[in-house]
Amino acid sequence: PDGRDPTAFPFAKVDYEETIKGKPTKQKIGFIRNIGFGPTPDQEVLKLCEVAVKVFEQMGNEIQDVVPPFNNGDLIQAENFYQTRTLAELDLLSSENREKAEVINNWADEAKHYSGVDHYRDYLGTQDLRSRMFRAMDGYDFLLLPTVPFPPFAAENPGLDDGDIFSPWCNTFVFNLTQQPALSMPCGKTSLGLPVGLQIVGRAQDDIGVLKMAKAYED
């Protein structure tokens, strides 16, 4: 841990390679097909994730569907918050370095029109997302959901083909807010050969549990 970081956890001497060996005990797992905001999940992506979830069920885990915890208005508020934060962080860079991030600059520039009250309202919105995500996980040991709910966009694009660069994060950014451990496992390819990932999310500080579940799936 870094002494300058008050959120850092104490050092834990763990041999992860040894610790994650062995089949995990039966767990209660929630499956989120649609988190509630962002683009409508692609059916081909969902089918691949459903096949992967069956593997966890065959291991003896209890699988339950989770009702979408969010709605599209939540995503707008979250994006506004991150635009404002990014704008402030970009202001710390030299003009030379800032010019290297044209896409992010253009995206964050929208926040120049937001007021201080707007920003704090958006901040409170992200805290509400955090609370609702914890409530959605209540009673589950792990959550499973598509890492990205649609196939990869064109490699030369910074985001979706319509210019939306925030929606690709819709299934992942909330776990930065909650500080839950999460990882993405490959779970197949679309008919066009594009990779699809299944995200495994654990309870706060249960990094080992997430790694165990991932290894069990991989094996």
Identify the residue ranges that each predicted region occupies.
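Acyltransferase
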Residues: 41-67, 90-96, 119, 123-140
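Short glycine-/acidic-enriched loop or helix-start segments at secondary-structure transitions
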Residues: 41, 75, 153-156, 194
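Short, surface-exposed loop/helix-turn segments at secondary-structure junctions
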Residues: 8, 77, 82, 121, ...
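Short connector loops at secondary-structure junctions
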Residues: 61-78, 106-110
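Short helix-loop capping/hinge segments that flank enzyme active sites or metal/cofactor-binding pockets
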Residues: 21-33, 80-134, 184-195
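Short glycine-rich anion-binding loops that position phosphate/pyrophosphate groups of nucleotides
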Residues: 35, 148-151
